[in-house]
Amino acid sequence: NAKLGAVHGFAGVIGGLVPVAHGAICAALLAPVTEANVRALRERAADHPALAAYRQAAELLTGRSDATVEDGVEWIAATVRQLGITGLAAGGLDPALVDEVVDKTGSSSSTKGNPIDLTPAELQQALVAAL
């Protein structure tokens, strides 16, 4: 995907607030944002090609031809834990800033590349999960 998406939209905003490496911010957000994207796609755009791409990614990540999208999300989350990447709050992101971060992320140019427009509530849920 040459476009970026909500993970990078969040990372740009959060990177200006805390002294955490861009890659670590992205890693902390990848599973929750992927989960939010998949849920939103299934609810609002069930025929979107991104769902097939997420399933193919899950197969590649897990090495299993029967892998589900959920298996891929769990693989990402497990890998992030194994790498010792902490949540964003441990990196210094104040939970009181969640609404501000969500607002700025929603209007970020990177977020416009997301496979589906996430609502502020969906963005907030993903960010809180990454804390």
Language model feature labels by segment:
Residues 1-26, 108-113:
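Glycine-rich phosphate/pyrophosphate-binding beta-alpha loops
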Residues 11, 73, 98-102:
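Short amphipathic alpha-helical surface patches that serve as generic macromolecular interface elements
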Residues 17-20, 24-97:
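Gly/Pro-rich interdomain helix-loop hinge
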